[in-house]
């Protein structure tokens, strides 16, 4: 008889635990959602992500145009020169970047005489070479790729965080609902006991009802936040389907440091600033402030100082050296200061990234240790429930004591599952710091 009662009690308790809160956790109202489904919704409907990709695409197109010839057209339909009407004129200018040191400029002008019968084309072509030009800065294609990856990883981390928060709160709601049922059963049993003072039980029951109401409010807020984040406006209530794995990883700091340094846009920018500052300082020391340029000009129908001796085609080559009369020691000191500041900024960036890496690695290790601890607690809770079953069969404990132990087991199981979720989030934080693609790696720990 006791075995049948105990089995019925256990089944009833599991139903209470799994049923969850009456408003937000019934299967008829909750919509199951997996991480893959949530990520698909986020990347399809997130406006900020779409605008970011659009901006990146436009930046890439503009950078590509910087390497192409630039053509400028100008027209002057009418004008007055020296009190006389001037005919219409027009010009087309061309600028062609030819690399680090060369630049080609050309202009073709077309005008009409007073009778607007004869076309007078004129033009010029200029080729410039700078002997002491600084090297061009490296393309920002890699930087743009890192920024896109950072944007994707941020969305993945936000999605995981929202799902985990909601999952934990739903589990807590089920725990507290089951605890409320337990207190109600305890109060009912107390009322059947003669002269039993149930004042504390009634206080606990009221307090538990208030706790459950607060959890309901928090659940509603989390559901609204998740719906807005996913771009869903139908007011659906979600039930995250999350299963996490604990990976056996060798977290070698030196290898991870290389990944972190290589994937940090801020560190790459700091390195570029230091390289530029050192180049400017080296150039100043080498040239002592002189700038040397060579240029060649080819002119068509350009009027010279003596119109009678003007030729249809004229050309000129020149070498120009310029120097700004400014105290050289001050210039050198300014450049040395800029290089020292850039070097200090780089060292600070590396130190900050290394501190973040060590914190992230320690977070993963601590979370892994917590999973192990919660696993031990779960095993102890399972052993406690088995012991309670044997004690109940021997008539040593009551049904309520068995129910209380079953509640402790459910709490230990949820704590163990939540510790694995925390571990997954800490590992994702570490991978994000290393610049890895979380869109695919996330399913290695969450499925």
Where do the language-model regions lie?
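C-terminal structural cap/anchor segments
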Residues: 328-331, 337-373, 377
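Periplasmic alpha-helical coiled-coil/stalk elements that build and connect Gram-negative outer-membrane
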Residues: 2-3, 150-263, 360-363, 367-371, ...
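Residue-level recognition of alpha-helical coiled-coils
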Residues: 61, 68, 153, 160, ...
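Outer-membrane beta-barrel proteins
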Residues: 82-86, 115-117, 303-307, 399
